[in-house]
């Protein structure tokens, strides 16, 4: 490998902002904030909005959108507007 062209790939702790869940992984991301991990070492801390701990797909709290009902509701509210034409 060539020197000085690759990003610094190091251990980082990611924390879910909503749940507080933390996990240690490797990344090129860096941060000024640090956290002491279970092994006693200090690692950079990256706070993220969504992780597998809080995302609806992974938590099972996923909702299915009723698109047919939404289209019918739209048609009821605005369907007649397209049919009406003003005569000049």
Swiss-Prot record:
PROSITE patterns: RIBOSOMAL_L31 (PS01143)
GO BP, sorted A to Z: translation
InterPro entries per record: Ribosomal_bL28/bL31-like_sf, Ribosomal_bL31, Ribosomal_bL31_B, Ribosomal_bL31_sf
Keyword tRNA-binding found: no
Gene Ontology, cellular component aspect: ribonucleoprotein complex; ribosome
This protein's UniProt keywords: Ribonucleoprotein, Ribosomal protein
Self-association and partners: Part of the 50S ribosomal subunit.
PANTHER family noted in UniProt: 50S RIBOSOMAL PROTEIN L31, CHLOROPLASTIC, LARGE RIBOSOMAL SUBUNIT PROTEIN BL31C
Protein name: Large ribosomal subunit protein bL31B
Organism (species): Corynebacterium glutamicum (strain ATCC 13032 / DSM 20300 / JCM 1318 / BCRC 11384 / CCUG 27702 / LMG 3730 / NBRC 12168 / NCIMB 10025 / NRRL B-2784 / 534)
């Amino acid at each position: 490998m060539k020197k000085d062209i690759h990003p610094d790939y190091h251990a980082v702790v990611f924390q879910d902002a909503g749940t507080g869940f933390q996990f240690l992984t490797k990344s090129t991301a860096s941060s000024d904030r640090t956290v002491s991990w279970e092994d006693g070492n200090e690692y950079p801390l990256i706070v993220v909005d969504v992780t597998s701990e809080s995302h609806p797909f992974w938590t099972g709290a996923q909702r299915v959108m009723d698109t047919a009902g939404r289209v019918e509701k739209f048609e009821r509210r605005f369907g007649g507007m397209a049919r009406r034409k003003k005569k000049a």
